[in-house]
């Protein structure tokens, strides 16, 4: 933000449900490598650049990455810096909006590694990215509307197709209630327990909100 590189984009919910957002925007789903930095050695940035050069990302104009697009309490040097009141309010508002808007409508770059599978945010993001919004609630996406782009890392480098197949089998066909129950288990870890509680409720309300749209 200090460099003036962030761009504020207001996204109508119509762009989420019609697929327009997916044509221009990709969001990165990942787990942080360290508590105070998402990518201390630059491995993820390199992987993101590789994926963006692929044909599957043609048309992408905007990339959303939490560390860069949400005000963090950790600087890019890994030091703690308290958010301003304004930044804290925006951060909390964003947490409640990400799943039912960004991750429901954009293309999703899944930076998968072994620990990704144990984290609440990545798994919730991946589940939502495999669904399509309908008047009946969330339904598994047909192939032509499927939005995840898998890019495996670390010990799973080069195993994109195998891991994607496995994750689709585990998550894509799950009914919302079953997904919420799985995400609510204690072995799905989250740094802030309140984040899990708030966003499980966000998922519960999604079908109702879609009916009202």
What are these language model-derived features?
Residues 1-213:
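The feature represents the membrane-entry module of six-transmembrane cation channels
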